[in-house]
Amino acid sequence: MTSPSPSGNVVVVGTDGTSSVSDRWPPQKTWISPPRVPIDRHFVTAAVPHVLMFLLVCIVFTAQQTRISTLEKRIDQLVVQIDQLPSSDSNTDDDDVAKSRRVRNSCMCPAGPPGERGPVGPPGLRGSPGWPGLPGLPAPYYRRPRVPLSNNLDESISRKMRAFGMLYSPDGQAIQLRGMPGPPGPAGPKGLRGYPGFPGPIGLDGPRGLPGTPGSKGDRGERGPLGPPGFPGPKGDRGVMTGPYVGPHAGPGPMSHHTNMGNVLPGPPGPPGPPGPAGRDGRHGLKGDRGLPGFDGESKIGPKGETGSPGRDGIPGARGPPGERGEKGDTAFLSTYPRVASSSTASSPGPPGPPGPPGVCHASQCTGIQGPPGEPGRTIIGPQGPPGEKGERGERGEPGDRGLPGAAGAANLLNGGKALVGPPGPPGRDGRPGDKGEKGEQGLRGDMGLPGPEGTPGKRGRRGRHGISLVAPNGTINEDLKKLLKTELMPLLIEDISELRGKNVIPGPPGPPGPRGHHGPVGPSGERGPQGLPGHSGERGDRGDIGPPGLPGQPGAGEISGSQSGPRGPPGLPGPPGEKGDLGPPGLPGQPGSLGLPGPPGPMGLRGPHGTEGETGKQGPEGSKGYPGPMGPQGPPGNDGEPGIDGRPGPAGEKGDQGIPGLDAPCPTGPDGLPLPYCSWKPMDGKNDVWERRKRASLPGAQPGKGAETRPPVTD
């Protein structure tokens, strides 16, 4: 029931007594929405992974069952073809029985009319092989002689069997299925060290450091600029009038000002005028007074440290050049020193004289080396002359060669004993490190080490990328793959095989079969092959099932009267079997199978050998000579050293007077009554020979460090 409303809407009253307002007529039917069921989100999130896993398992199981059923069909077809082949051990009785059956079942009636074309049969067998592949490389070993196949198996059938993964014996009596792949072989040797990887990413920023110590209080700043003008002050008090008030209307008019200016008194100041315009910014103020001194800050200078350990002794300075030779002393007299009365021994040298003046100090070392002793003078040894005056400082000479050790000290020579060996000096400073030597040659590869422990299995690898298909979508061989094989794979294979030919290589056992590759895309249907030869007639099979009813036969020969049809005639005899049809085109290849699960990772390889110790690197270049250090303080005088080797001979002295030959002189005399030269007490030719000097020094009565030069006895 409806009733109009004042607003133009229609009030709809339902059969159940409910009323509603609608702006249309007839009112639209309201659909009753089903009640909402609350859904638990946690339940949904927990159930979705399980449902997806169940669907995935179902899909995998269905795919496996499909593959198994497809293989079973193919095997059944192969079994049928094998059964159709003639058997060599067939008996003649079976042939007779088959012949009788054919005669019995043959129809003697005339052939009926040809029947209609039957339905399309099932897809045929696999087509002929495709295009021949690229020529393979020759094997590095001798090929085994090929066993001729039996006549029982056709070449095409055997090829198909091999394509399906079956093997057959050479005599054709046994068919073997390919077994399951064996376990993975042992891991190969460890490969070479790879190239260094890419540099890693920049590391994260380190933690924030601790806050530093607060700084000291700064100096007081300069005085700031002058501030803006202040607000106007409050209104002042009213002033006090001291004279008569003259208002604005007090005078008679403006003429009074001109007539008598002296009698008019100024009035009080008026009210403040309006504020004037803002003034300009003032100048900067003067610098303020200096602030009070700040507090003392924390001292950054720590306490005085402890006394350090004493430093090492300085390196001894270089040896200085020899000093200048002094002037020759005065001739000595016999009255100064006692004479030697013995005629069997040579005269001994006199006591040492007083020390001479210090030598000239050079920049490198103030103490000069001791000069070599001069040759003996006259027999009469005079006293030491007075020291000469100090000469002027000469120019610095070039450093000479290292001299031989000097003679022993005077004190030890007088006592006749050997000099004491002084204590060893302090160790010298460590030398500067030399420059870095050149990089040594790479060491030889070490022997193979012991096998390490078996490692834990690695993680599952990532799924590989899809490879390049051998067959292009148009049914031909992929051109990119051809180019890849010719340009990259073929040169590598030829090089490896050429290397193998040059060596006595024994082929190893065949490796385990690799994983099954991806199925290529579906190729186009090949051309129809030529019709095959008729096969051998097989044995009679079992009775088949009852076939479908045949087609209606032709009308009988009876007359038809009126519109009535005659009785139905008996069914006609079956016609003879038709000729075998042509071989159908090859069926399309099946769908590619799903990728198999990756196999378990192989065991960890053996531990590689330890490398041998590398060769010693080449010696680096000798470092540059250091600069001479500053001259250290003069050390204490050391003990007298051992007598050294004789120094170089000094300059030749003045020739002495000829002595009187001895009474026991073995030398012959010359025409002048004197001994021949180079005889008796005169020096020998081997004076400068070291061996000769040592020999003369070993004679009794010889002076240490001097040659065994005999002198004639001194007589009165």
Curated annotation (Swiss-Prot):
Record carries keyword Glycoprotein: yes
Assigned keywords, A-Z: Collagen, Cuticle, Disulfide bond, Glycoprotein, Repeat, Signal
GO BP terms, alphabetized: axon guidance
Disordered: annotated span: 85-122, 183-472, 503-716
Biased composition annotated in UniProt, kind: Pro residues: 266-277, 349-358, 568-577
Entry GO MF terms: extracellular matrix structural constituent conferring tensile strength; structural constituent of cuticle
Glycan attachment positions: N474
Sequence segments annotated as region (Triple-helical region): 179-238, 265-298, 302-330, 385-411, 422-467, 507-557, 566-603, 605-664
Basic and acidic residues biased stretches: 280-290, 389-401, 429-444
Compositional bias annotation for Low complexity: 402-422
GO CC terms in record: collagen trimer; collagen type IV trimer; extracellular matrix; extracellular space; neuromuscular junction; plasma membrane
Keyword rRNA processing: no
A Pfam family matched in the record: Collagen
UniProt function note: Nematode cuticles are composed largely of collagen-like proteins. The cuticle functions both as an exoskeleton and as a barrier to protect the worm from its environment.
Complexes and interactors: Collagen polypeptide chains are complexed within the cuticle by disulfide bonds and other types of covalent cross-links.
Family named by the database record: Belongs to the cuticular collagen family.
Protein name as it appears in the record: Putative cuticle collagen 99
Organism: Caenorhabditis elegans
Lineage: Eukaryota, Metazoa, Ecdysozoa, Nematoda, Chromadorea
GN (gene name): col-99
